[in-house]
A protein has these predicted regions:
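Beta-strand-enriched cores of mature, soluble protein domains
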Residues: 1-152
Length: 152
């Protein structure tokens, strides 16, 4: 069982994801990040479309949407809806929630998510049984997201 010093559990994948597009609802992510506009009091909803490769016990491609909400108090809430397509042709639904913490003075966020994986595939039935915690970083300037997931 592979372990990370800061996280318990078995490491089941590492992902290198790209932010392929952003849908905004009245205020753009760029305007917020550059300081042109503040996050409105009611918050800002952004749909982040992601796609990329994952390696590990669960290897393949992940693509989907994070219905992200930037709050006026600085917190970022995550609402993940992703499809995992394994290298051997199976599909796994990934849903999750969590939060991201912006770093001061740089376009980076630290990501903390609570993940649920579900599938009817016999070969991957093991993903249905356990909780997954993931941690990572997002570089909002380059659109690169790196996440590592641990089965509890």
């Amino acid at each position: 069982m592979a372990q990370d010093q800061g996280m318990r559990g078995e490491k089941i994948y590492e992902c290198d994801l790209a932010l392929v597009s952003v849908t905004d609802y009245g205020v753009s992510m760029d305007d917020i990040l550059t300081g042109k506009k503040a996050v409105p009091l009611q918050g800002a909803r952004l749909d982040l479309h992601i796609d990329g490769a994952c390696k590990g016990r669960l290897s393949g491609r992940q693509h989907g949407i994070d219905y992200l909400r930037m709050r006026a108090d600085g917190r970022i809430d995550l609402d993940l809806h992703v499809i995992v397509e394994t290298d051997d042709g199976h599909r796994i639904a990934l849903s999750g929630d969590g939060q991201a913490a912006p770093r001061n003075g740089e376009p980076m966020i630290d990501i903390f998510a609570n993940i649920r994986l579900t599938t009817a595939s016999k070969e991957y039935a093991w993903v249905n049984e356990r909780q997954i915690w993931s941690v990572g970083t997002g570089d909002l300037a380059t659109g690169r997201i790196r996440v590592t997931a641990y089965m509890q």
